[in-house]
Amino acid sequence: MKVGVIGLQGDVSEHIDATNLALKKLGVSGEAIWLKKPEQLKEVSAIIIPGGESTTISRLMQKTGLFEPVKKLIEDGLPVMGTCAGLIMLSREVLGATPEQRFLEVLDVRVNRNAYGRQVDSFEAPVRLSFDDEPFIGVFIRAPRIVELLSDRVKPLAWLEDRVVGVEQDNIIGLEFHPELTDDTRVHEYFLKKAL
């Protein structure tokens, strides 16, 4: 199995390391790769859109020709996980977006960009997961905020206290936080099971 981490900007290497460790823990043969060109898409069983800066990721996905084929693959059922800026890229509606920004618009949520403020307002906190009783340490860095679920297809996947901070819709996972910045691979393992 190959998992493509869109490697244009953001915390790509951390996702590659977390994915490779999760594959090993699941006993699955495979690897995570830096996904930079459309021709690599035929190799992958799943895609991760990392954190970073959503405007830059959007622009580079369009410039490299990844934008439209990635959107089509997701719409056709390819598993995808977006974290932080990746969540913004997946979202149907984005508050605070500039008119020239394009998003994949495949996940039925409304998000607010940079809802947690500046870099100095970043924090870590225990997050409750729908698929495991043990808390997960969520790392929130200038994170977007899920402000509304726009359809019944979207299911909460993670909560910070009583607020939804992660969602799942069929083959799509969107997270406000960065699961790749911890040593805990449970979120990556859960995601990879979608591609098995």
UniProtKB/Swiss-Prot annotation:
L-glutamine binds at G52, E53, S54, R113, I141, R142. Pathway: Cofactor biosynthesis; pyridoxal 5'-phosphate biosynthesis. It comes from the Archaea. Catalyzes the hydrolysis of glutamine to glutamate and ammonia as part of the biosynthesis of pyridoxal 5'-phosphate. The resulting ammonia molecule is channeled to the active site of PdxS. Keywords: Glutamine amidotransferase, Hydrolase, Lyase, Pyridoxal phosphate. It catalyses: aldehydo-D-ribose 5-phosphate + D-glyceraldehyde 3-phosphate + L-glutamine = pyridoxal 5'-phosphate + L-glutamate + phosphate + 3 H2O + H(+); L-glutamine + H2O = L-glutamate + NH4(+). GO terms for molecular function: glutaminase activity; pyridoxal 5'-phosphate synthase (glutamine hydrolysing) activity. The active site is at C84 (nucleophile), H178 (charge relay system), E180 (charge relay system). GO terms for cellular component: cytosol; glutaminase complex. Its EC number is 4.3.3.6, 3.5.1.2. GO terms for biological process: glutamine catabolic process; pyridoxal phosphate biosynthetic process; pyridoxine metabolic process. It comes from Pyrococcus abyssi (strain GE5 / Orsay). InterPro entries: Class_I_gatase-like, PdxT/SNO, PdxT/SNO_CS. This is Pyridoxal 5'-phosphate synthase subunit PdxT. The keyword Hydrolase applies. The gene is pdxT. Belongs to the glutaminase PdxT/SNO family. In the presence of PdxS, forms a dodecamer of heterodimers. Only shows activity in the heterodimer. The keyword Transmembrane helix does not apply.
